[in-house]
Amino acid sequence: MPWRLPTGHQLCRLCLLRKPRPALKIKPSSACVTYGTDSQSDKENKRTVEKLSACSVDIRKIRRLKGWVLLEEETYVEEIANILKELGANKTVIASILERCPEAIICSPAAVNTKRKLWQMVCKNEAELVQLIEQFPESFFTVKNQENQKLNVQFFQELGLRNVVISRFLTTASSIFHNPVENNKQMIGVLQESYLNLGGSEANAKVWLLKLLSQNPFIVLHSPRAVGETLKCLQGQGFTDSEVLQLLSKLKGFLFQLQPGSIQNSISFTKTTFECTDYDLRQLVVKCPALLCYPASVLEERIQALLKEGISIAQIRESPMVLELTPQIIQYRIRKLNSLGYGIKDGHLASLNGTKKEFEANFSKMQAKQGRPLFNPVASLKVEE
């Protein structure tokens, strides 16, 4: 039987048979408005949405990133915006801060004002404070343990750290301020004592400590026990106090993140691979502390990648810093050097080392040198009469 479209009479019968859908019921509410989606219906605080919109905040961004904030019953949009405005932030900056850190609106104004006073302890002026808040809003609007944070700021100031360094800690290493101030003091004392026990001078102890802390503030989060175990492990491997102190300074305190077992495995692998004496091994590690940081499996992978490029073990031993680079970076740099006719197999590996910026700068110099004429046609010739 051929297929046919239903007639108008048949369509009417179908419509009568179909059960009508119930009308959508919306409960009136002064506190929230309902937004329907395919998967769920989120109840948002209408007053919060309206106040954020009045601040020129893109509500869509908040819904996409941290929509839960809009569900909170108690918010302080106007109060937080006013605090930022009092500091000198314009409307655009305020909107940007609230879009990227919408949880700011659930912080009590009193807590935010306390945090404001805390950050003002290390900022030169309010303009600098606003700039920091704009760059790191989440750090500023984390308002727990404020009294402990204040004690830590005062401790670091008494220790001799500059305010610009402390402000950097507040924004990028805020966890150290939540650490009990007694713990931070204890760890600083352990580091200073370790420095002196390893042969460091009393006169240079404070300078060394402040430099170490500014390079790696997270070092205070380690336990004194971990420090003792790491130092004991290195000394057990034959490293002298002077060599351990060099490693501690070069690794900027990251040395204490290494487990004794991992250190022993890396040292054993290095000694076997390079077939060196205990003394040569220690010199190699001091020259390239990364040999301690990477697991034996990573070191082996990188050595094999270098060998495939025709580089010898002797070359690697002469310039071990090359092991700080991944195989992909090594391959890329070798190709670039080969494009200049530089035979890495026969040369020194130092040209491969360094950061990306350093390598590119050296490569540009080599490139310029290669294109330079053998003589300067403009310079006058010295002719003997």
Swiss-Prot record:
The keyword Mitochondrion applies. One of its GO terms (cellular component) is mitochondrion. The keyword Transcription regulation applies. One of its GO terms (biological process) is regulation of DNA-templated transcription. Keywords: Mitochondrion, Mitochondrion nucleoid, Transcription, Transcription regulation, Transit peptide. Belongs to the mTERF family. Binds mitochondrial DNA and plays a role in the regulation of transcription of mitochondrial mRNA and rRNA species. Monomer. This is Transcription termination factor 2, mitochondrial.
